[in-house]
């Protein structure tokens, strides 16, 4: 029997909440290292990698037992944060914010294979292109994005964006990069080939996370300061003009953070840092249906189908 779960990281109590989406309740709580912040689940669903930022460690969790089975450490971990996996799941990319480095980790051995300095300020997140060939790394303090080639495992470019970029994702069609700039409350829509900024949009206060629905129809942006989610219709057609447009701003809890969709794209789930809960958003009605209580200061969130 298939079950759907959320894995929610509770930063201020050093735990993970396992939420059963059928029961809409926490079914298990697991202790982690200090300050679990960001998470990624392997493509086969067997493992999760949890960046514990203030603990300077990456916890490896077995998703069958929900036990921490390994801890990855390195002397140059300094607020390890953004995590992402290659398309085959064989390599984990980790951004270490204050040491301004990217670590490439073999997921079969959980050994660090390569350390790459970005030479940029506060390298914070990891976002892969849909084809898995490119990694985009927002540098909050340098107001730019670092581009890495996955095949060569080398940095190939940096390009400027707005102030304080954090939430970054590539549209499923591979043609546009969306960047949420938290310091001036804007969204940039950028051509992946030319890196030209095609559109600039004002969104909510302090946008920090950005995800696309599986079909690419919507982008959701978590606005931390204004406690809401900007719903962007990626191809709104007005009198023959197709453009991305904010069609709704959904109130959620205080300090909206991590967002994830279910596999079908029918629901999105938003971790509310300061109300200690997760908002369930119905993507057909574009309304918050309910909230699920979790631990203290939830932020990183992942969807798991077993």
Please provide the spans of the model-predicted regions.
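Predominantly soluble domains enriched in secretory-pathway, periplasmic, or organellar proteins
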Residues: 1-306
């Amino acid at each position: 029997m298939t079950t759907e779960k959320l894995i929610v990281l509770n930063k201020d109590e050093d735990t993970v909440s396992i939420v059963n989406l059928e029961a809409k309740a926490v079914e298990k709580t697991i202790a982690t290292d200090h300050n679990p912040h960001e998470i990624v689940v392997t493509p086969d669903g067997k493992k999760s990698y949890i960046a514990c930022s203030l603990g300077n460690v990456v916890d490896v969790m077995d998703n069958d037992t929900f036990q921490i089975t390994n801890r990855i450490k390195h002397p140059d971990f300094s607020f390890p944060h953004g995590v992402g996996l290659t398309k085959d799941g064989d390599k984990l990319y980790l951004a270490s914010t204050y040491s301004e480095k990217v670590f490439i980790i073999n997921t079969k051995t959980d050994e660090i294979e390569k350390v790459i300095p970005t030479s940029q300020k506060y390298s914070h997140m990891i976002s892969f292109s849909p084809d898995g060939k490119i990694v985009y790394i927002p540098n909050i303090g340098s107001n730019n994005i670092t581009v890495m080639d996955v095949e060569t495992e080398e940095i190939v470019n940096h390009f400027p964006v707005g102030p304080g970029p954090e939430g970054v994702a590539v549209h499923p069609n591979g043609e546009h990069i969306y960047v949420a700039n938290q310091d001036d409350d804007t969204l940039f829509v950028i051509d992946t080939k030319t890196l030209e900024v095609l559109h600039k949009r004002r969104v909510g206060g302090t946008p920090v996370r950005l995800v696309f629905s599986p079909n690419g129809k919507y982008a959701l942006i978590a606005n931390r300061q204004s406690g809401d989610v900007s719903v962007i219709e990626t191809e709104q057609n007005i009198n023959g003009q197709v453009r991305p447009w904010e069609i709704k701003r959904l109130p959620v809890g205080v300090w909206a953070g991590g967002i994830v969709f279910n596999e079908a794209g029918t629901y999105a789930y938003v971790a509310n840092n300061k109300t200690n809960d997760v908002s369930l958003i119905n993507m057909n009605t574009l309304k918050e249906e309910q909230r699920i209580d979790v631990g203290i200061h939830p932020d990183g969130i992942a969807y798991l189908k077993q």
